[in-house]
């Protein structure tokens, strides 16, 4: 038995072949890759080709395009993405054949069961924080396994099978599936209104579900929570597990002081609990929110015994995560050249944090914001917040709402959103994928920065734009 095997779950009974429905999803492909590396035979299906599908195939994983009942042939268990409904032909066929159908989080929990699990939760910042924790543990020689909801730029993947007991995962609250997990350590970055249909529109239910998640820690586990978040402060007195806090406030256990932003470079000093000394941190990820994400990762790394030099070096070397304030390069348009930044942000708070980071990195440059709203329900429930934050852009190009499988809601449109923003004397232009390049040729001035933002198809549009569409 090699080192990578001794910390893994025992073989799952008679399970040899595992089929993933929606294997191209950010939360699915990483689990599939880890299981493939453990020796299971993996198959999967997805609606279309993608870079993720191509990567899985390059590893030797069979991926079918389209959902058909014959795709599950030979499967001992079927893993279902939360984006896949129960009427999917593969799900229906599996149930008829009495093949177990489980949610992705149940499989993630099984992978974690015999390991030292570190789960990163929160409405915003999960992917970056999970990536930072994984990077610092790797830099410290702990060789963790990880499953992240985005591509870690340093390795070009969102999952890795390490040789140690440590297993770092992004914990998803969108469908409350993080309650499947029983980690040894957990981070909660923040609690904000999103995916409220899961919580029946009840914010108190959302808040208490995060508390329940933290109570899945053992009594000797560790919760690491952000003291800057108002909702976390509300549940803090009720957390019945060992807890450390982080933030800018003086009472935080892990505290950032003297933060400065010079271009893309963030620099700050982190004050840690005794006997740990202060560290001067530099890393190429802008914005106040990313200082907080770094603090969470420093807390986890310190508590696991990663040495100071490795923490400092790991943050200096951090190359970021795909689609999180990712600079794609500079492109020449008809009236000038502009930098293109791709970002996954799709919630008003995420947009606000990104715009704040933009203003700190490029205080003299004009922000040309191309935004694709994601989901009708989110656009409807957070309409006022979207109007407020999108009004902060210098030029706003608004795309149609990306449905993400939802049925359209009457009256919930990008045009209605645009009209309310226009009532504030802001110019808004409705664009499509087909008209985007021509519109940018008309708008762009030399030195502008284009922010392509959203959780839908806009990420591929940004790549296509760099390739001259």
Swiss-Prot record:
Cell wall formation. It holds the Pfam family Mur_ligase_M. It is an enzyme of class 6 (ligase). It is found in: Cytoplasm. The lineage of its organism: Bacteria, Pseudomonadati, Pseudomonadota, Gammaproteobacteria, Legionellales. Pathway: Cell wall biogenesis; peptidoglycan biosynthesis. GO terms for cellular component: cytoplasm. ATP binds at residues 122-128. It comes from Legionella pneumophila (strain Corby). This is UDP-N-acetylmuramate--L-alanine ligase. One of its GO terms (molecular function) is UDP-N-acetylmuramate-L-alanine ligase activity. Belongs to the MurCDEF family. One of its GO terms (biological process) is regulation of cell shape. It catalyses: UDP-N-acetyl-alpha-D-muramate + L-alanine + ATP = UDP-N-acetyl-alpha-D-muramoyl-L-alanine + ADP + phosphate + H(+).
């Amino acid at each position: 038995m090699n080192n990578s095997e001794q910390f893994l779950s025992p073989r799952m009974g008679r399970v040899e072949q595992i089929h993933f429905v929606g294997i191209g999803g950010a939360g699915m492909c990483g689990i599939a890759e880890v299981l493939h590396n453990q020796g299971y035979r993996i198959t999967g299906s997805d609606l279309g080709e993608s870079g993720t599908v191509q990567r899985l195939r390059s590893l030797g994983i069979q991926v079918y395009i389209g959902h058909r009942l014959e795709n599950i042939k030979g499967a001992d268990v079927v893993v279902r993405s939360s984006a896949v409904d129960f009427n999917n032909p593969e799900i229906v066929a599996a149930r008829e054949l009495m093949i177990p159908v489980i949610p992705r989080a149940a499989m993630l929990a099984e992978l974690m069961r015999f390991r030292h699990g570190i789960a990163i939760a929160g409405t915003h910042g999960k992917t970056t924080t999970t990536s930072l924790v994984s990077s610092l543990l790797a830099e410290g020689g702990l060789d963790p396994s990880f499953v992240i909801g985005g591509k870690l730029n340093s390795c070009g993947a969102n999952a890795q099978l390490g040789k140690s007991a440590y297993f770092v995962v992004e914990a998803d609250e969108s469908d409350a599936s993080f309650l499947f997990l029983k980690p040894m350590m957990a981070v909660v970055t923040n609690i904000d209104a999103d995916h409220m249909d899961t919580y029946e529109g009840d914010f108190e239910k959302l808040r208490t579900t995060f508390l329940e998640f933290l109570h899945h820690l053992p009594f000797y586990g560790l919760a690491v929570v952000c003291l800057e978040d108002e909702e976390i402060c509300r549940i803090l007195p009720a957390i019945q597990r060992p807890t450390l806090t982080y933030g800018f406030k003086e009472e935080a256990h892990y505290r950032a002081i003297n933060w400065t932003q010079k271009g893309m470079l963030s620099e700050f000093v982190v004050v840690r609990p005794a006997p740990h000394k202060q560290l001067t941190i530099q890393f190429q990820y802008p914005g106040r929110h990313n200082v907080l994400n770094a603090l969470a990762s420093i807390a986890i790394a310190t508590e696991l015994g990663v040495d100071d030099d490795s923490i400092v070096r790991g943050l200096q070397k951090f190359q970021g995560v795909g689609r999180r304030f990712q600079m794609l390069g500079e492109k020449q348009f008809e009236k000038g050249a502009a930098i293109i930044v791709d970002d996954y942000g799709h919630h008003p708070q995420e947009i606000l944090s990104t715009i704040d980071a933009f203003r700190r990195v490029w205080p003299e440059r004009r922000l040309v914001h191309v935004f694709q709203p994601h989901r009708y329900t989110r656009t409807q429930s957070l309409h006022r917040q979207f109007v407020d934050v999108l009004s902060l852009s210098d030029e706003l190009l608004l795309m149609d709402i990306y449905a993400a499988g939802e049925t359209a809601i009457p009256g919930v449109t990008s045009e209605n959103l645009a009209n309310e923003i226009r009532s504030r004397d802001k110019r808004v232009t409705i664009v499509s994928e087909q008209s985007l390049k021509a519109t940018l040729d008309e708008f762009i001035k030399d030195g502008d920065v284009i922010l392509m933002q959203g959780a839908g198809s806009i990420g591929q549009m940004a790549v296509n734009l760099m390739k001259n569409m």
